[in-house]
Amino acid sequence: MAVGKRIYLKRHMPDKEVMMQFKNIPASNTCDVMGRNAAMNPRIRLVSQPKEQMAVGPALTVKARGGDNLALHAALNIAQEGDFIVVSNEEDDTRSLMGEIMMAYLRYDRKIAGI
């Protein structure tokens, strides 16, 4: 039986010194040592032009049903400066969960590191 939506407001944040040690390690190597359990779909491509080649920060994870961005709206206000928002939407590539207005809010107001 499904338990419905859950939003965890308390986050266990990683130690900044430990995070910074990952700055020069390729993501593929990190994925390998985590049992190949933390990689993105290879169809996902970079669409921005980041200032730095590699970035490190805590992840705020969002699990949403395809086409349902309610959980993502909650994440907009939970995200902290420097966070990366990672969204799983049941691999639905037919509908977008966010657009330009939400992206601008995250970038300029919340100052997240990436999505």
Where do the model's predicted regions map?
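Surface-exposed charge patches
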Residues: 32, 104-105
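Phenylalanine-focused residue identity feature
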Residues: 22, 84, 105-108
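Intrinsically disordered, low-complexity regions enriched in acidic/Ser/Thr/Pro/Gln residues
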Residues: 1-63
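General beta-strand structural signal in soluble alpha/beta enzymes
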Residues: 42-45, 63-64, 86-88, 114-115
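A glycine-rich, hydrophobic loop/mini-helix early in the fold
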Residues: 50-103
